[in-house]
Amino acid sequence: MSLEIPPEWKKFRYRGKSLDELLNMPMDEFIKLLPSRQRRSLKKGFSDKQRRLLEKIRKYVREGKYSKTIKTHVRDMIILPEMVGLKFAVYNGKEFVEFQVVPEMIGHYLGEFSITTKKVEHGEPGLKATRSSLFLAMKG
């Protein structure tokens, strides 16, 4: 079972290349298309954790398990064309954040889609929290 490519993905272009061209392109040529930070990172090679994740990804693609979610802590893995269509759950320090990789994510890091901080929402200040609250009627 191969990945069914939705029509909107067929219109996608990354640096002038279609998704089909990217999937059939050798890794060396793909690396030349990436921005400098990602290009330099991939030229160094993959770390052991990244290599294990890539092997797992290739196994899932070979077996056609596109609906199964891949859980990982590897936030610094660059999204490659072969990852398009797969579901990932990336750890943000507290929980796993799930998302499906779409072509627009190619060249970004997995960690960019699993935000580690959330917006602080303060409640109402308590009694004596501010100087003006001394003059408010007592709650109760």
Curated annotation (Swiss-Prot):
Coiled-coil positions: none
InterPro entries assigned: Ribosomal_uS19, Ribosomal_uS19_CS, Ribosomal_uS19_euk/arc, Ribosomal_uS19_SF
Sample GO molecular function, one term: structural constituent of ribosome
Cellular component per GO, a single term: cytosolic small ribosomal subunit
Biological process (GO), any one: translation
Keywords: Ribonucleoprotein, Ribosomal protein, RNA-binding, rRNA-binding
Record's function text: Protein S19 forms a complex with S13 that binds strongly to the 16S ribosomal RNA.
Family: Belongs to the universal ribosomal protein uS19 family.
HAMAP family per the UniProt record, alphabetical: Ribosomal_uS19
UniProt-recorded name of the protein: Small ribosomal subunit protein uS19
Phylogenetic classification of the source organism: Archaea, Thermoproteota, Thermoprotei, Sulfolobales, Sulfolobaceae
